[in-house]
Amino acid sequence: MSMADRDGVIWYDGELVQWRDATTHVLTHTLHYGMGVFEGVRAYDTPQGTAIFRLQAHTDRLFDSAHIMNMQIPYSRDEINEATRAAVRENNLESAYIRPMVFYGSEGMGLRASGLKVHVIIAAWSWGAYMGEEALQQGIKVRTSSFTRHHVNISMTRAKSNGAYINSMLALQEAISGGADEAMMLDPEGYVAEGSGENIFIIKDGVIYTPEVTACLNGITRNTILTLAAEHGFKLVEKRITRDEVYIADEAFFTGTAAEVTPIREVDGRKIGAGRRGPVTEKLQKAYFDLVSGKTEAHAEWRTLVK
């Protein structure tokens, strides 16, 4: 089933449109130049009902991204929150992946963005583990990419922008063609930045390390894991991380809304730790899934019921 050929509805500029009718013109500006921003959000089945995890944080980042790109979203944050709930609710989804996107219309061509209408869509559909259930249990193989992560002054790394993900796609395609599952990207100075679409953590001697958010996205799942790790008593250090530090780590894992908490078992042919999901990773992974699925009362404010 293609993404275009599905039953259901998509929130499109304030209206719930039939899925197959949610189309736009081939001369839409963002399709040609990549100037747009988006989010990846998840909803989970909880004992209280379907709940969107950290909805407000995602909506805030969407607006921050648009502001960085100088795009004016024609709706309030509350309206986008309610539209996100509606996209899940009206598709009768117990759990879902949600894609809000802000993009320019087809009022003109060329690099000047003046006079272009800003559109907003929000789609929601069922989507399981990003790299498969086995990856969550056994971990994945990672390859260091030959493609450098963006310099902070090239693509505005605090914005989750459409065009920036060309860099991610090139890195991921290279990794997969080389027999890996995911890429590890370095910043312009050669330090570890992130995966193609995930933040990275390593554990060494019981201390959890993660790169500073300079060349990587300030991930919402990353921030969630930092909170959970602190609550579990782990020492946390945000710093520059070298490639060889990853090689000799006891454990490593990726985080992201799509990837959730995915262990890394191998990097560049080198086994990480015991070559499987480590105990710290497993503990944080369980804490994360307990949190998003409402098995704990902690951080109830991060779970927004759709009904």
Curated annotation (Swiss-Prot):
Source species, domain of life: Bacteria
GO biological process, one term: L-leucine biosynthetic process
Pfam family name, one: Aminotran_4
Keywords: Amino-acid biosynthesis, Aminotransferase, Branched-chain amino acid biosynthesis, Pyridoxal phosphate, Transferase
Catalyzed chemical reaction(s): L-leucine + 2-oxoglutarate = 4-methyl-2-oxopentanoate + L-glutamate; L-isoleucine + 2-oxoglutarate = (S)-3-methyl-2-oxopentanoate + L-glutamate; L-valine + 2-oxoglutarate = 3-methyl-2-oxobutanoate + L-glutamate
CDD domains linked to this entry: BCAT_beta_family (cd01557)
Keyword Amino-acid biosynthesis: yes
GO MF annotation: an example: branched-chain-amino-acid transaminase activity
Pathway assignment: Amino-acid biosynthesis; L-isoleucine biosynthesis; L-isoleucine from 2-oxobutanoate: step 4/4; Amino-acid biosynthesis; L-leucine biosynthesis; L-leucine from 3-methyl-2-oxobutanoate: step 4/4; Amino-acid biosynthesis; L-valine biosynthesis; L-valine from pyruvate: step 4/4
GO cellular component, one term: cytosol
Cofactor: pyridoxal 5'-phosphate
Residue numbers of N6-(pyridoxal phosphate)lysine PTMs: 160
Keyword Amino-acid biosynthesis: yes
EC number: 2.6.1.42
Xref: PANTHER family: AMINO-ACID AMINOTRANSFERASE, AMINODEOXYCHORISMATE LYASE
UniProt function note: Acts on leucine, isoleucine and valine.
Family: Belongs to the class-IV pyridoxal-phosphate-dependent aminotransferase family.
Protein's name in the database: Branched-chain-amino-acid aminotransferase
The species this protein was found in: Pseudomonas aeruginosa (strain ATCC 15692 / DSM 22644 / CIP 104116 / JCM 14847 / LMG 12228 / 1C / PRS 101 / PAO1)
